[in-house]
Amino acid sequence: MIQVSRVACQEKGAYAIFQYIENIMVEKTTMFYIKAHVCNLEKALQGHQASVTYQGGIMETEALSLIDADRYPVHLPESTAYLTLIQQCRHDIKTYGACRLPGFTTPDATRRMAMETDRVVHEAYPCRDTHNVYMEKDNDAFSEDHPRRRGQTSELDVIAYDQIDPGDGLYILYQWDDLLHFIAVVLEHASYYRMADPLAALTVNVMHEGQNHGWHFDEAEVTTTLMIRKPEEGGVFEYVHNLRSDDRNEYDQVNRALNDKHPDIQALEVEPGTLLIFSGYYSMHRVTPVKGHVTRYVATLCYKDQPNVYNSLEVQKLFYGRTA
């Protein structure tokens, strides 16, 4: 059998467009029959069946090459280092509301992801929205000075999942089962799934100069992101840990944060290559306006505790300008 991949084709000085993929799961092995149009590649490749061993659809070695596996052995669940990492992440989320893994992706992999994002950034949808911190529209049932009436403006561009090439590093990382399993163990989920939404499952938030994301709570309990590119200035991730609770009224504290007077507002330093697991449902957060000509890229990897989860058509339309 001949192994065919976009990387392999590029190394041979050729360009391949993968048009059709059928995958058949056999335990942890996925057999891919790939019909490809191949340009300037040896004729021997044409018409052959390609047999590749994948875990969760992505070659283990290619996924591993993207991360600092010595520092973050997410592929070795029986190792002492893995268990130590799990304990540290759980502690950080409980204590600080965030587990930050700097240098999770290697410098080369991070640069690769930035370049691959550069390739499609012109296709990003410009999302402009005014909302309150609960991601709701204005509700005149509350007084004008109520936190639910205090509008926040968010302005960013969004690259959708279906705009990310299956050969891109970010796509490979997201499809890697070992990463999915690692995050599930950190969060103590018996079952965890990649989001089924063809637009929202994996996205890149793009922030040019002047763009920002206003104060808000996430709808998801936990969000997983990867910093791909940091701006020259601004674009700072700020949050107030555990501001929202299911059993208390947090409006006074929300108002203090909106007035920039809350004593617990923290700026989280996130360098390119950092994987962040963040409890955004309970922690109010924002991204300050970007300054300078370097565009900020942050990928969001969406996982759910139930299969076949899609965003509503309204949410799809807001963030991607279309539905799917």
Protein language model regions, located:
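Fe(II)/2-oxoglutarate
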Residues: 29-94
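Interdomain hinge/linker segments and adjacent boundary elements that couple functional modules
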Residues: 137-141
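Short, solvent-exposed beta-strand-terminating loops
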Residues: 124-132
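Acidic, Ala/Val/Gly-enriched low-complexity intrinsically disordered segments
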Residues: 4-16, 22, 26-27, 36-38, ...
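Short amphipathic
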Residues: 99-104
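Signature of the catalytic double-stranded beta-helix
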Residues: 105-106, 112, 116-120, 124, ...
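Catalytic core of non-heme Fe(II) oxygenases with the double-stranded beta-helix
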Residues: 166-171, 180-271, 275
